[in-house]
Amino acid sequence: MFSHIHPDNYDAQLSKKQQDMAKLFSDFNLPAPDLYPSVPLNYRQRAEFRVWHEGDDLYYIMFDSKTKEKFRVDDFPVASELINNAMKALLATIKDQRELRFKLFQVDFLSTLSGELLISMLYHKPLEDNWQIEAEKLKAQLSTIAPVDIIGRAKKQKIIVDKDYVMESLNVGGKTYVYQQVENSFTQPNAGVNEQMLLWAQQATQNAGGDLIELYCGNGNFSIALAENFERVLGTEISKTSVRSAQINISENGIDNIDIVRMSSEEFSQAMNGERKFRRLEDFDLTTYNYDTVLVDPPRAGLDRDSVELVRRFNKIIYISCNPETLKDNLALLVETHQIDKFALFDQFPYTDHIETGVILTRK
């Protein structure tokens, strides 16, 4: 099933993506795109597998996206080497361990460039005290591969051995940034390309000055790397988990000019306009911010109409998109007031139809 995933095929698939993007955005007067390729193998830091039980045997499976048929997975060439090593070691260790094996239906892996690993094991059964005892033994055995933590999940249960996050280190422009990444929260899966995205955004905002507002800031991925280019940064995020991670990451990186508030872009727009007062903003005077630059990294649905109207109020817009189709729709509105200065293609997902794009727009 993975025969197409090979370094010999990488350049051709990337070239096709360039052609597809040029065709999709042909109605816009785009500058020549900046292109940021991925390494051709072992680039994903996250992977999820179902577990198939067959007599005494058990193995990972995935499902064909077109036929929906299951297929066996012993190696996963797009995942990090650390994940591939852990995949094999985990099954070999639990194969004859009933407490860890019985009713196990899924395993999720989260690894880092810094060499840490988090494994989540999902069950169709309640987890008893014996499960934790055996999970601690499993952790000790797998720790010969890398620093590892294990999470057991069942209905209304979550057992952590010993933490539910990893600490990633990303090198951007010769500087290392540290990020807490929590299980089940969003992180960029291709860490190498993420480093390139952060560098591109850093360089695009050099000497920008003023303040940066980031909507959908997640764990502070962009805000932290861009903080040095701005006087102040204000990030908004609706996930409590991501807000907590962002606060930790701000502290870990010794940054003192970022604030994070938990609210949606719609709520932030209402606060900016003075339409509503929020207790969460009691310590912030939004009238003191210089609303010059905004960064948005929305979900696949893109920006809704109200959010488009919000970002149009800024002189500079940095738009990171995981869905070119919704980006195209949003750009059709944004180019009425702004011009496209930079356009970038980030190959976050080689050998798939998906591509991450970045656009810098400035007011006409």
Curated annotation (Swiss-Prot):
Please list the GO terms describing molecular function.
rRNA binding; tRNA (uracil(54)-C5)-methyltransferase activity, S-adenosyl methionine-dependent; tRNA binding
The record's top EC class is transferase
Out of the domains of life, which is the source?
Bacteria
| A cellular-component GO term for this protein | cytosol
**Binding-site list for S-adenosyl-L-methionine:** 188, 216, 221, 237, 297
| Keyword Methyltransferase included in the entry's annotation | yes
Family designation? Belongs to the class I-like SAM-binding methyltransferase superfamily. RNA M5U methyltransferase family. TrmA subfamily.
What is the name of this protein? tRNA/tmRNA (uracil-C(5))-methyltransferase
What's the source species for this entry?
Colwellia psychrerythraea (strain 34H / ATCC BAA-681)
